[in-house]
Design a protein with these regions (language model features):
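Hydrophobic face of amphipathic alpha-helices that form TPR/SEL1-like repeat modules
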Residues: 106, 110-114, 130, 142-149, ...
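Non-Sec secretion/translocation targeting segments of pathogen effectors
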Residues: 1-6, 24, 816-817
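Short hydrophobic alpha-helical membrane-entry/anchor segments
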Residues: 791-797, 808-817
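TPR/TPR-like (Sel1-like) alpha-helical repeat modules
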Residues: 766-781
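Short helix-capping/linker turns of helical repeat alpha-solenoids
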Residues: 102, 114, 133-136, 149-151, ...
């Protein structure tokens, strides 16, 4: 006689009946009835002969006297009611006895057989009987797993938790470990790390390797590193690769155990041999950096490759780096981009940043600014500072995205707040120039300072300039020089040039021509045109360098060819006067023109002089006037005087005394002595201005005190005749002498008159004759006539007269002949 098992599944109603593994068709109306009514035939149109009858009608190979065993999955009270009904409705004492005789091991074995046969639902029901009716911990654990995975029953993490707890409370190590995971991963219950640690540690104490690893991990999360090491060690000794890896991390960092990089590398190796990708990657890092092992880039590459092929995102990133830089493998931009892309597509920010770099520069992929910006953005949104900085750059200049300076500021700030020095500098620039944000030099200085303190050379130089010029902070040359020097020492050419200026003029440092020239030379050798020009000046003037005009010209030429307007002007001067080169007026005019066209006001004036006097270019007063006017509009005093003179005389422009006076005044206000003299003349004569002798005398005095001979002569006239000043012959004589000493023939003649007649000086005809002669030698007709007059009237003794007459006659002949 064979045994046929009847399985009944009940929740709040009859769910199913399986007879010998075959499902029974049960009308819905029957399923909802009380237990006792299952055994009664249905009334009306429902086809149901009662559970007993339906069981017997199922075909099992013609067996007439089969014995039935019953398995009821459901609440205990319903089970009892069901078994009473089985007995009452005469399914057989033998069947009932068979059911009662089954042991928990029978259920467990049958459940496992059903599992192997793929009959998950039957396996679950058998595990449930053993778990519920017999309280068997293994069965409780299996029931929990079925609920957790939805195997043979509807998935329910809450029910899984209930059964894991039942088994765990009976000290089942696997259940304790699983229960710890439920609390750790918040499966069917709120996350509770403390409760998770309690159950993991209970299982760990029984030797469960997974629980030992997880106990160590939870202690590590609390920074209880000694306890973490203890449990990692226990799990590692059982060859748990995860624990070996984590223990290696502890040894490498010295967390909870003495630092031992060699031990760390060995633990990584053990885990790596087992194929643990995280350890393979970390072992690669050890070989890359020589941490605990001899540096070996080829070995590092192999470790990265193994981990990368398993999908380890860090290893894929590292493998991309190896291919990018040729680390342990032949440099291959295509492979670099490919592996970076694999990691990037998994969301690894550093790889996304690198992939953006590859697209930006066209390395290993076709250049694509839009894709570059896209990958930068993906990394930036994960908080990757370098990507935030580069995304800011993209928005700042409109590369791969539409230009948007406010977005640039947004991303620069994100990166800057994470300490990215480049972004801090750029944010400072945005504040300094009002780019994408309101201009704020004080805020600019703050960000420059942050970047400068991290060694960013551009920021160091920018900060130095702020202190140098007093932008956003008080002028402080000492602080300026300190920051400028830091940037200069890192090779920043602009900083080297400005440091040269500091040493040249003593800004923040002691003046030192040799140091100045040294820094100019460093910058000049990097192609800095300002420094090349300044170095040329050092050689021209012999300051900090031996005087060498040819060397000066060499550096002027380098700077001039680089477009430096000051150097172009100086080179023009060298060619004009033959200083360090052979005189060449055509080349002089050429370089003056280039400098003038670059906006150099001195060169504009010099180029005007070329046109005025036909130096190296055809004489053209109208063109001269154009360039004088251009220079004058730029505020160059000498050009203002020249254009004033042109308007005064009508050279190249229509004569206009008012315009002349206007330009004389502009130049005079800047202290130009010639302009002061001529403006004085305008006031004396009332040309272009209202006649004003007092103002005229004031201007003559300003010019005269600067040594202008014509003004000294004119001021002498003012004092001689009392024009605009009190008449003072002695003062007139003083100013005539100053002009006469500079070779002014009219002043020399006047001084002769004063000595001959004793005006403002003691009469002295010998002195008078000497000054007349000086004036006459320059062709002064009045002086010649005065000499003739004095010779006719006699002078001194006969000997003296003869000597004087002889000398005068000889001189006269030379001048008149």
């Amino acid at each position: 006689m064979s045994e046929i098992q009847v399985e009944v599944c009940f929740t709040d109603k009859l769910e199913s009946v399986r007879v010998g593994g075959k499902p029974m068709e049960i009308p819905k109306a029957v399923k909802a009835k009380p237990v006792e009514e299952w055994f009664e035939p249905a009334a009306g149109r429902v086809k149901w002969g009662g559970l007993g009858a339906e069981i017997k009608e199922m075909d099992f190979g013609g067996e007439k006297d089969a014995a039935y065993s019953f398995l009821f999955n459901g609440p205990e009270d319903k089970k009892q009611e069901f078994m009473e009904c089985v007995e009452r409705f005469c399914l057989g004492e033998e069947a009932q006895q068979e059911t009662k005789k089954k042991t928990v091991q029978d259920y467990l074995q049958e459940a496992k057989k059903n599992q192997q046969a793929g009959n998950a639902e039957m396996a679950f029901q058998q595990y449930m009987v053993a778990a519920r009716d017999y309280g068997h911990p293994e069965a409780q654990f299996e029931v929990a797993r079925c609920y957790q995975n939805g195997t043979g029953v509807e998935k329910s993490e809450e029910n899984a938790l209930v059964w894991y707890k039942k088994a765990a409370e009976q000290c089942d190590a696997e259940a304790q470990c699983a229960l710890g995971e439920c609390y750790y991963q918040a499966r069917g219950v709120e996350k509770d790390d403390k409760e998770a640690r309690r159950w993991y540690e209970a299982a760990a104490t029984q030797g469960n390797v997974t629980a030992q690893y997880m106990t160590g991990r939870l202690y590590a999360e609390l920074s209880y590193n000694v306890a973490a090491v203890k449990w990692y060690t226990k799990a590692a000794e059982q060859e748990c690769p995860e624990a070996q890896y984590e223990l290696g991390v502890c040894y490498e960092a010295g967390d909870g155990v003495g630092k031992d990089e060699a031990k760390a590398a060995e633990l990584y190796r053990k885990a790596a041999v087992q194929g643990y990708a995280e350890a393979q990657n970390e072992l690669g890092a050890c070989y890359s950096n020589g941490t605990g092992v001899a540096k070996d880039l080829e070995q590092a590459f192999e470790c990265y490759r193994k981990a990368a092929k398993q999908g380890n995102v860090k290893a894929q990133y590292n493998l991309g780096v190896c291919y990018a830089i040729g680390g342990g493998v032949t440099k291959d931009p295509v492979q670099a981009a490919e592996w970076s892309a694999r990691a990037a597509e998994q969301g690894f920010a550093a790889a996304q940043y690198n992939l953006g770099y590859f697209y930006r520069n066209g390395e290993g992929v076709e250049k694509d600014p839009k894709k570059a910006a896209m990958w930068y953005e993906k990394a930036a949104e994960q908080g990757f500072a370098e990507a935030q900085y580069m995304l800011g750059y993209c928005y700042n200049i409109g590369v791969g995205v539409e230009k948007d300076t406010s977005k640039a500021v947004f991303w620069y700030r994100k990166a800057a707040e994470q300490g990215n020095a480049g972004a801090q500098y750029e944010l400072g620039e945005c504040y300094y120039y009002g780019n994408g944000i309101d201009e704020n030099e004080t805020e600019a200085v703050k960000w420059y300072q942050k970047a400068a303190e991290q060694g960013d050379t551009d920021a160091q130089f920018a900060l130095g300039k702020c202190y140098y010029y007093g932008n956003g902070t008080e002028v402080n040359y000492e602080t300026a020089a300190r920051w400028i020097q830091k940037a200069a020492e890192q090779g920043n050419a602009d900083a080297q040039n400005l440091l040269g200026d500091c040493y040249c003029y003593g800004y923040g440092v002691e003046p030192n021509n040799e140091e100045s020239a040294k820094w100019y030379e460093k910058a000049a050798n990097q192609g800095n045109t300002k420094a090349q020009y300044s170095l040329g000046r050092c050689y021209r003037n012999g300051t900090g360098k031996r005087k060498d005009l040819a060397e000066a010209v060499k550096w002027y030429e380098k700077a001039a060819e680089g477009g430096n307007a000051d150097a172009q002007n100086s080179l023009g001067y060298c060619y004009e006067v033959g200083e360090g080169v052979t005189e060449d007026l055509a080349k002089a005019a050429k370089w003056y023109r280039e400098s003038a066209e670059n906006g150099n006001e001195v060169a504009q004036c010099n180029f005007g002089l070329c046109y005025e006097y036909g130096k190296g270019i055809k004489k053209d007063l109208a063109e001269a006037a154009v360039w004088y006017d251009e220079s004058a509009e730029h505020g160059y005093a000498r050009a203002q005087f020249k254009i004033g003179l042109f308007y005064d005389k009508g050279y190249g422009v229509a004569q206009n005394k008012e315009e002349a006076a206007k330009w004389y005044r502009k130049a005079a206000d800047q202290g130009d002595a010639d302009a002061q003299c001529n403006l004085g003349y305008c006031y004396k004569k009332g040309e272009g201005v209202t006649k004003d002798p007092v103002r005229a005398a004031e201007l003559y005095r300003k010019s005269a005190e600067q040594g202008n001979a014509t003004a000294q002569y004119n001021l002498g006239i003012c004092y001689e005749y009392g024009n605009g000043v009190t008449l003072l012959k002695a003062t007139a004589a003083e100013w005539y002498r100053k002009a006469a000493d500079q070779g002014d023939s009219d002043a020399q003649y006047k001084l002769g008159v004063f000595y001959e007649n004793g005006y403002g000086v003691t009469q002295d005809k010998e002195q008078a004759m000497q000054w007349y002669k000086k004036a006459a030698e320059q062709g002064n007709e009045s002086a010649k006539n005065a000499i003739d007059g004095m010779q006719g009237g006699g002078l001194g003794t006969a000997v003296a007269a003869g000597a004087a007459l002889g000398g005068a006659a000889l001189l006269w002949k030379i001048l008149r002949g």
